[in-house]
Amino acid sequence: VTAPLTDEDVPAFWGALGLPGLIDAHVHFMPPRLMESVWAYFDEPGPLIGRHWPIVYREPEDARVERLRAFGVRAFTALLYPHRPGMAAGLNAWALEFAARVPEAVPTGTLFPEPGVAAYVERAIEDGVRAFKVHLQVGGFDPRAPELDAAWGVLAEAAVPVVVHAGSGPVAHGFTGPEPFGAVLTRHPGLTAVVAHLGAPEYDGFFALAETYSRVHLDTTMAFTRFFEEMGAFPPALLPRLRDLGESGRVLLGTDFPNIPYPYAHQLQALAGLGFGDAWLREVCWHAPARVLGVG
């Protein structure tokens, strides 16, 4: 298949693969004020960013939804996350309202280690939330926190996938790396997890978790893009394992739209450029995320 050179080429890319579109497991939508504050954070190369990060798709919410539709993204998560206690339940309510307005959006919740977390996670699932986002870096918390144990159990029991930013990229902070989240999986081996950014930069350790636990997946967010490779190249020795994981349905397309400093098409270019073939791309860009997110 020919890699898309521009965003206008994206539909031809998935069309040539014989797919009905794309499913993106790592897209951000959040209340406008929170999105503005996230963008402001990216404007200042702060401690968790570490470099210049000019966001390409800094547009009103409606325009961002229309852009995804134009790309042919048939379903996408709407990832959001709290940075302090007392935020998560309100974010979950907003996410359900957003998904009710935008049929392509998979209703996405979040959590924070605080009293009552298991109860509001359970309630969110009852209300229709179909995926969760946990950002260990921004949240700055330990996934092994005792308050979270019951919540992880609820998620595992309900087979609701959790997209987890658990790697130490772009800047190591708090309880990142494979060990803390690996300890959660030891306690809850049935948890359906999607490790964001292929677990960068601790690829090896997170690949090992995916190879050990049958419900652990990885998303491709920013991986192999020029921007990401400048921060630390993917180890070539791991490419065969990435190919195998993708072929076995454990790698999901993720992009970080809209918070990316390059066109959407560049992520697809980067994946096509791996040379793993069309069947691998079909699995990553549609079949695996469709299964994990229960869409398509």
Language model region names:
Residues 4, 74-176, 225:
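Active-site gating/metal-coordination segments in enzymes
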Residues 26-32, 165, 197:
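Histidine-centered divalent metal-coordination motifs
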Residues 26, 95, 124, 132, ...:
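Conserved, mostly hydrophobic/aromatic
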Residues 33-38, 89, 120-121, 175-176, ...:
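Short aromatic-enriched loop/helix-cap "lid" or pocket-rim segments at secondary-structure transitions
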Residues 3-6, 130-131, 141-252:
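Catalytic pocket-lining loop regions of alpha/beta-barrel enzymes
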Residues 92, 116-118, 181, 202-206, ...:
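Short, well-ordered alpha-helical microsegments
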Residues 1-25, 34-66, 70-71, 75, ...:
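Mid-to-C-terminal alpha-helical segments outside catalytic/metal-binding sites
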Residues 29-30, 168, 200, 259:
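Short active-site segment of divalent metal-dependent hydrolases/proteases
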